[in-house]
C-alpha cells in the first residue's frame, strides 16, 4: 500500500518545505545566493511546500500547477504570501503562458523538483524555459533516474508488495501491465504508472538535452539516498560513491536522486 505521507497532504507539504530549506536551497547556494527580492518560479509546484521555503527567504514567487486541486491547495498553503503580493499560483499549462503578458519580470531561478520525469517532451520544455529566464538565469532540477530501484514511482501503488518491490518497473510493458492488473491496481493507477514508464529520464539523456538547449551544468550531485528519505524513512542522505558516478548507465541503477543547477547560455 502507499505510504502514509502519500495520503496525508499536510505531512507531505511539511516534508517538501523542510527538504527544500535543508538541502535544495543550500545546494543552489553553492553557486547562486538566494537573496531577498529574487524572482523564482516553480513549475509543478504541487501544494506549495517547496516554493514556501523560497518565500520564507524573501523571494518573489510564482507557482505553476497543471492540476486544479493541487493549485487550490497551494493557494491555501501560500495564502499569506499571496495576500501580501509576494506570490501567485497559476493553474495553467506552461505552454499556455504568455511571458510578456503574464509577468512583470523574467526569472532569476526556475525550480523543477520531481517534475521533469513526468513531462512527455522534455526537449521542448527545456527549450521553452529559456524564454522565462533572465540572461544568465538558472534552473534547478531534482529527479530520480528512471532505472533506480523505485524509478517507476511504484511506492505509491496500493498493493503492499508492489509498493515495496524495486526495479520491477523495468519489465517490458505487457508484463508490467499484467502484474499491475493481477495485483488489483485500479485502471487509473495503471495508466499513471505506465505514463511514468513513458517519460522516465536517465542521467545521460538529461545531460544531452541540457547541452542541446544551450544550458551549462554548474552543479550536480548524485545521491545514493535521496535527501527526502530523511523525512519519509528516517534515512540519512548520502551522496553516491565517487567511482559509481563515473560509470555511465550503470550509475542510473544505484543513484536514487540527482540534483542539478544549470545556467542559461547566451
For each predicted feature, which ranges?
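Short, charge-rich amphipathic segments
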Residues: 1-15, 58, 137-149, 214-217
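Conserved N-terminal segment of class I S-adenosyl-L-methionine
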Residues: 1-105, 109, 126, 225, ...
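Short, surface-exposed alpha-helical recognition segments that flank or form part
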Residues: 12-19, 117, 194-197
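A structural helix-start
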Residues: 71, 119-120
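Adenine-nucleotide cofactor-binding loop residues
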Residues: 95, 116, 147
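A short beta-strand submotif of the Rossmann-like class I SAM-dependent methyltransferase core
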Residues: 112-113
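S-adenosyl-L-methionine-dependent methyltransferase catalytic module, highlighting the catalytic core
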Residues: 120-128, 138-263
Amino acid at each position: 500500500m502507499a505510504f502514509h505521507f502519500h495520503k496525508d497532504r499536510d505531512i507531505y507539504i511539511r516534508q517538501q518545505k523542510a527538504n527544500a530549506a535543508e538541502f535544495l536551497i543550500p545546494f543552489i547556494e553553492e553557486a547562486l545566493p538566494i537573496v531577498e527580492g529574487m524572482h523564482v518560479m516553480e513549475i509543478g509546484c504541487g501544494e506549495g511546500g517547496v516554493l514556501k521555503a523560497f518565500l520564507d527567504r524573501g523571494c518573489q514567487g510564482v507557482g505553476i500547477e497543471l492540476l486544479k486541486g493541487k493549485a487550490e491547495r497551494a493557494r491555501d498553503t501560500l495564502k499569506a504570501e499571496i495576500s501580501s503580493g509576494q506570490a501567485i499560483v497559476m493553474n495553467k499549462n506552461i505552454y499556455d503562458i504568455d511571458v510578456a503578458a503574464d509577468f512583470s519580470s523574467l526569472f532569476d531561478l526556475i525550480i523543477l523538483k520531481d517534475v521533469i520525469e513526468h513531462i512527455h517532451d522534455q526537449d521542448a520544455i527545456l527549450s521553452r524555459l529559456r524564454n522565462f529566464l533572465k540572461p544568465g538565469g538558472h534552473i534547478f532540477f531534482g529527479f530520480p533516474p528512471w532505472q533506480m530501484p523505485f524509478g517507476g514511482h511504484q511506492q505509491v501503488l496500493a498493493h503492499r508488495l508492489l509498493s515495496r518491490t524495486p526495479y520491477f518497473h523495468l519489465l517490458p510493458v505487457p508484463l508490467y501491465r499484467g502484474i499491475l492488473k493481477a495485483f488489483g491496481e485500479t485502471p487509473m493507477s495503471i495508466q499513471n504508472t505506465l505514463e511514468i514508464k513513458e517519460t522516465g529520464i536517465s542521467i545521460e539523456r538529461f545531460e544531452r538535452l541540457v547541452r542541446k538547449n544551450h544550458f551549462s551544468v554548474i552543479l550536480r550531485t548524485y545521491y545514493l539516498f535521496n535527501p527526502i528519505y530523511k523525512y519519509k524513512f528516517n534515512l540519512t542522505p548520502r551522496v553516491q560513491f565517487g567511482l559509481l558516478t563515473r560509470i555511465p548507465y550503470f550509475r542510473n541503477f544505484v543513484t536514487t536522486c540527482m540534483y542539478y543547477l544549470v545556467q542559461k547560455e547566451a
